[in-house]
């Protein structure tokens, strides 16, 4: 009896030891919590392990898409499609390190998108937001291009095959995106598999030669919501956390080089060209609206430029604008117009119209047929303009504050317009 009891005691002791070890391991691997060091370093959770607080539908106010919480994980039910099933954060992020664990079902397809811009004109988030691709390559039913595989910057940059160590479906992987003022890194299970610089000439060439050639605003935003994708396959996510990085301001940018239109895109059939070191905009035979827009976004900035109205001077400088379709550019316009028509005022295109016009007594500040100096300062929801050293407007507007986009020069419709520009110089804020 003693022998049997001793054996039983030893067995119980072993089981207790194993249970204790398992318990310690579980505690050590507690999910959806931050360590003291992570908190001190500025990390924050985007998922609390219990609820979907902080998330909502893309372009929505509440969450109705196919997502739920199961056993401390966000799960995509697999009911989504290319056109639906997107869940986004209720906050925007600019520069950051984003880390998360993910697990796919057999043949699964999902993704993590960032810098997603929400507008009624955009039915799906991938029109604007870059995507870290997640896919079960060995079991996916269709042939995949390299830019469609796990870890890719979807339809843009492919990961280094020699560094790929993705675990099979049903097992957890960890991924990380670093976005630091245009420098981008993709990580997978502790290894850096991809890095590139956004918004360079090479980046724009790649963007305009592939899938995104017909998506003019893809990847341009410096700030946006983070998005999870249900692409019709169950997928699980946990330990979603982010550390925000500082913006590098004070960058000096010469928007026009005096030689060509590098860094700009023209929309419409009106004429934009360089002559004698000047940027010229001139009405074409169609006599329609025309725009010359920067390829890159500038949200907070201080811009100075000079313009001269050589013919009808109905033009303008758009701020935080975007290409909606064809030659339609949407945004806010700092007016450039003949005397008596509010040069320096702010007009919202395809929206509320005039937000602020200039007093009649300030109309004589414009020098028609001569060079004028305009300054535009945009910071948050505040816009200030100056003409020839005199302040014209100072306005705060919440809708402008939520905007983001390009700088664009405009030719008004009606024909007979010719305006020349020079010394377009910008400082980021």
Residue positions per predicted region:
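Carbohydrate-interacting regions of secretory-pathway proteins
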Residues: 29-429
